[in-house]
Amino acid sequence: MFDIGFSELVLLFVVGLIVLGPQRLPVAVRTVMGWVRTVRSLATNVQNELSQELKLKELQESIKKAEDLNISQLSPELSETVEELRQSAQKIKMNLEEKAAETNSSVEEQVQELKSAVQNSQGTATTEIEKNFDFPSGELSPAELAELAEEGEPMLEMGESDFSEDEQATASSNETIENIKEKV
């Protein structure tokens, strides 16, 4: 960089040793090396920026030249190829739009079919359950309650132990339960 030979470098070192002394010479060398690194990095940054600007300028000039030539001055074969590409792009776009519309309609149809199938299966399952299990409609009459109590239905055999944990169960409600048991 500075075109300094070995003998000149030794001479600078000896002068620096005499002027600065052995204690300050290493600090001075580090400082000078830091300056040299900074100058080198600045020079490379400026060089890179200039080369990028030149490339950008060349690209802009070539774009201007291409615009000046215009598409009308292209060869007839190239113009035909460009037109064919445009037509094929339009055909592909139309095909994609048609396929998208078909897909959307088929998806909507499938959703409607699934909804109706679910509704039908729910209705069928409810009627199947009602057929298989004879559910009494409405409320039970007192006679039917008594009949179920004699058969030993677990829901009708509730005693005081079932209500003992309830804090609001009072003595009158316990008596009412016992009265119902006696009647049934």
From Swiss-Prot:
One of the record's GO molecular function terms: protein transmembrane transporter activity
Annotated transmembrane regions: 1-21
InterPro entries according to UniProt: TatB (IPR018448)
Disordered: annotated segments: 149-184
Gene Ontology CC: one annotated term: TAT protein transport complex
Protein family according to the UniProt entry: Belongs to the TatB family.
HAMAP family: TatB (MF_00237)
The protein's name in its UniProt record: Sec-independent protein translocase protein TatB
Species the sequence originates in: Histophilus somni (strain 129Pt)
Gene name tied to this protein: tatB
